């Protein structure tokens, strides 16, 4: 039977990275299940919880709840989701935690989740990316304009260590860490933050078992694969190389536990590689002010326009 991996998602935001993992379907098998996601910002956490609810409902019933479709079509006000599907809502509120990493409540919740993940899944994966404001070029420019700002006193520079503490506790099969490109040039204590991060990652497993081998996602000949990085910039992933109509560049580090690293060697997946314009992706979406409503059709949701 194919392996199933339990996911720990840190600094989750509204859950985009976790949604990508959870949505993967391999011939009817979903290899990734989110065990816990952690986000401290309230509005992002609301979206995170709703997405967890929708996944749980769809797993139980095979479709999205009609109330969700009607709500987004403007036909009804937002319902109480616990009344729509109480079991799915309980699952969602247990999965999506509104907590701040580095605090005792967060540590207790993550430790509890780790125990369940080890019991219920073949192995685990850690995903997430520390908040980027301290590393982004815009964030750094704003910080310079603040009177009395001292980078060494900005805790956001060191949030990656909360990620590493969980990584050390979980010891997953693999991890994925994402951040803005500015992380490569951001400095604190007269050192590059990226250099500090890589040193901390490399120290895991020293003298106590398996370490992690860091890999970069590289695209060549319309195929993506995990490769050793010769330089920090190799970790930059360019969205347009994957057919995304956006020039969004992000640093993504993939770490593979050393006892599994050989399995990733020589493996690749096809990618689009075709440049797409925004109109290619959303040109068929309905006009926001065009009226009409959504109904179920043979190919999914269909917009019925008013005459």
State where each predicted segment sits.
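Class I S-adenosyl-L-methionine
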Residues: 116-120, 133, 137-307
